[in-house]
C-alpha cells in the first residue's frame, strides 16, 4: 500500500468543508488537495501561475470526479495580490474550514518581491502571514476552522538576523531559506 493510500484511510470525512491550499497546483499541495477532495472537501487551489492552476484544476477534476473545486490567483511575493485574493475569498465563500499554507520558495538567487523584500522572507513569511491575517475574520467565524503551515527541517539551520532581513548586508540562498522556515 502506498503512503498516500494509507493517509487517505486516516483522513476523516471532509464533506461540506471548504479548504484553501496555497501552491496546490503541484507537488505536496496538489496531492493534499486530491486526498482532501477524495474525502469530500470543496477545494480552493491558490497559485501564482493561472495556466498551471487551470491544468491542476483539470487534473483534480479528472482524478476526483464530482469534486467542487475552484482556482484563485495568489502571488505571495506581491502584497497587492495577497490582498486581492483574500478579498475574493471572503466575498465568494461564507466559510473557510481550513487554510493550508503550502506555497513557498526555496533557495533562488537574490531577488526582491514586488514590495522590495528579500524574495524568500517576503514570500515564505510576510506574504503567508499577511494572507492568513486577512483571512482570519472568515476563519474565526467558521466553527472549528484550522490553519496548517508547512515548513521544512531546514529551520534547524536558521537564525533570525533582524539586522539583515532584507539581505542588504549579504545573502546566502540557503541561509535565507532556513531563516524563512524558522520564522514560519
Describe each PLM feature range.
Residues 2-184:
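Rossmann-fold NAD(P)H-dependent dehydrogenase/reductase core
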